[in-house]
Amino acid sequence: MEIFPAIDLKEGRCVRLYQGEFSKETVMNEDPVAQAIIFEKLGAEILHIVDLDGAIAGESLNLPVIEKICKAVRIPVQVGGGIRSLVAVEKLLSVGVEKVILGTAALYDKSFLEEAVRLYKEKIIVGIDAKNGFVATRGWLDLSEISYISLAKQMESLGVQTIVFTDISKDGTLAGPNFEQLALLQKSVGIRLIASGGVASIQDVKKLNDMNIYGVIIGKALYEKTIDLEEVLQVTKLC
């Protein structure tokens, strides 16, 4: 199982939100580059970065910080947030980003998604963020009438190989992932699933591993030290 330490960027800082609400932010580190280096030194093999400002604006607003992170670490970096054009994808890949996560664009611009998958194949990941089972977009501010299962099936049919699934109600809560929705999603599609939101303990990670979930994104639990990164990396290697 892949472990993805999370760095959420807002105004150039590393922050955490509570249930996706921008008004409920906590600054975890004023220096995201330093945080990325910390994660790498602890053994992280890949980083998950979200440009929160970009998710709202519809364009990458933290590109200089993302570029600095890519130059500062030797491990791969995947990035999401506000990526809604091929130019944006190409720009991120050109500064050293390994994989790009498309969210809003996956729902509203299928032709862009298809072209991105055609050009960049496994480098394109789709992020499905759900609230009460329905897909949320534009930085989680808008709720659609599309179910997360329906969108996942569409993505699979378009050649997407990996999905990041986030239950917004769990994000930043340390209340545990939504295992039920993840299990249903796993039954519905045959592509890689990365779980995000609510992971609070090594037991949560073990349960996801037992479900054969491909990867898990861990944010608040690492910053609040309810999960030790070195320990969880060791545990997942032994499983």
Curated annotation (Swiss-Prot):
EC code: 5.3.1.16
Cellular localisation: Cytoplasm
Catalyses which reaction(s): 1-(5-phospho-beta-D-ribosyl)-5-[(5-phospho-beta-D-ribosylamino)methylideneamino]imidazole-4-carboxamide = 5-[(5-phospho-1-deoxy-D-ribulos-1-ylimino)methylamino]-1-(5-phospho-beta-D-ribosyl)imidazole-4-carboxamide
Domain of life: Bacteria
Protein family per UniProt: Belongs to the HisA/HisF family.
Pfam families linked: His_biosynth
Keyword Nucleotide-binding appears in the UniProt entry: no
GO cellular component: cytoplasm
Family annotation (HAMAP family): HisA
Biological pathway: Amino-acid biosynthesis; L-histidine biosynthesis; L-histidine from 5-phospho-alpha-D-ribose 1-diphosphate: step 4/9
UniProt key word DNA-binding: no
GO biological process: L-histidine biosynthetic process; L-tryptophan biosynthetic process
Residues the record marks as active site: 8, 129
Sorted UniProt keywords: Amino-acid biosynthesis, Cytoplasm, Histidine biosynthesis, Isomerase
Gene3D superfamilies per the UniProt record, alphabetical: Aldolase class I
A Gene Ontology molecular function term of the record: 1-(5-phosphoribosyl)-5-[(5-phosphoribosylamino)methylideneamino]imidazole-4-carboxamide isomerase activity
NCBIfam families: 1-(5-phosphoribosyl)-5-[(5-phosphoribosylamino)methylideneamino]imidazole-4-carboxamide isomerase (TIGR00007)
InterPro entries for this protein: Aldolase_TIM (IPR013785), His_biosynth (IPR006062), HisA_bact_arch (IPR006063), Isoase_HisA-like (IPR044524), Isoase_HisA-like_bact (IPR023016), RibuloseP-bd_barrel (IPR011060)
Protein name: 1-(5-phosphoribosyl)-5-[(5-phosphoribosylamino)methylideneamino] imidazole-4-carboxamide isomerase
Organism of derivation: Bacillus cereus (strain B4264)
